[in-house]
């Protein structure tokens, strides 16, 4: 029985790469794939799905006025699977049309996309997918601080995190960065830099402690085997207080 799948993740989590690899796997088994993308995504060419690792493939472009179910019947009725990239930009009606392909044609549909915008608001298309998808999977990635990234932060020309503006503003690594919820709180990267500095201090303390431990160990060996300060052990006690 076919299912509607939604695989979501923050920017840079390999969503497009996984979509293209899934397409390759189906085609390697002589299966016909209908790859689609919304017309609003024109970053890498209007009819191309592109991944940061260099993979790319031509796709059927879907405009907001298109009925995906009707297009499927007209253009690709013999497809074995439908794969959608940037699915968050589809309308709620178009998500229902993908659901209809699954139910009436018994064809699996795999949707890849973002969950939320730069203000952590759910995209309408993604919201509908959460409501009607049979299988929902998170594609995980990390923030620059090492925590799990869930926020698609929009970066302004001044390098600060933007907190207002239109929901849709196309861009790649120059405009967006996947972050955890903590990093963009101060609206800039000072918090991360501060944390990095603190981690550096912690590392320095660790190195100092290790050095003191080695020094104490060496002195202890000399004391044990060569009898240094044996007559007055208190002279070496201070070494063990470092």
Model-derived features: positions:
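Conserved P-loop
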Residues: 1-71, 117-128, 141, 170-196
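Walker B catalytic acidic pair
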Residues: 86
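Residues immediately C-terminal
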Residues: 89-90
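N-terminal amphipathic/hydrophobic targeting modules at extreme N-termini
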Residues: 197-212, 217-222, 231-234, 239-240
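Low-complexity, intrinsically disordered or signal/transmembrane-proximal segments
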Residues: 224-226
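Sensor-1/coupling segment of RecA-like P-loop NTPase cores
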Residues: 102-125
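Phosphate-binding/switch region of NTP-binding enzymes
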Residues: 124-175, 186-188
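A short acidic, amphipathic alpha-helical/loop segment
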Residues: 22, 93-101, 125
């Amino acid at each position: 029985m076919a299912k509607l799948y939604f695989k979501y993740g923050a920017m840079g989590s390999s969503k497009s790469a996984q979509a293209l690899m899934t397409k390759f796997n189906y085609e390697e088994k002589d299966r016909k794939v209908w790859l689609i993308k919304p017309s609003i995504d024109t970053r890498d060419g209007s009819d191309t799905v592109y991944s940061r690792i260099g993979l790319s493939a031509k796709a059927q472009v879907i405009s907001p006025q298109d009925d995906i179910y009707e297009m499927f019947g007209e253009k690709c009725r013999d497809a074995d699977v439908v794969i959608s990239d940037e699915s968050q930009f589809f309308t709620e009606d178009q998500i229902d049309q993908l659901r209809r392909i699954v139910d009436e044609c018994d064809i699996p549909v795999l949707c890849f996309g973002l969950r939320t915008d730069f203000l952590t608001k759910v995209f309408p298309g993604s919201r509908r997918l959460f409501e009607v998808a049979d299988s929902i999977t998170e594609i995980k990635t990390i923030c620059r601080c090492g925590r799990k990234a869930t926020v698609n932060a929009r970066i302004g020309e001044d390098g600060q995190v933007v907190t207002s503006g239109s929901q849709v503003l196309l861009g790649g690594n120059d405009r967006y960065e996947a972050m955890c919820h903590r990093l963009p709180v101060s609206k800039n990267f000072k918090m991360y830099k501060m944390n990095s500095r603190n981690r550096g201090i912690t590392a320095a303390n660790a190195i100092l402690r290790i050095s003191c431990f080695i020094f104490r160990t060496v002195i202890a060996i000399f004391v044990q085997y060569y009898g240094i300060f044996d007559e007055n052990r208190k002279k070496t006690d201070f070494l063990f207080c470092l």
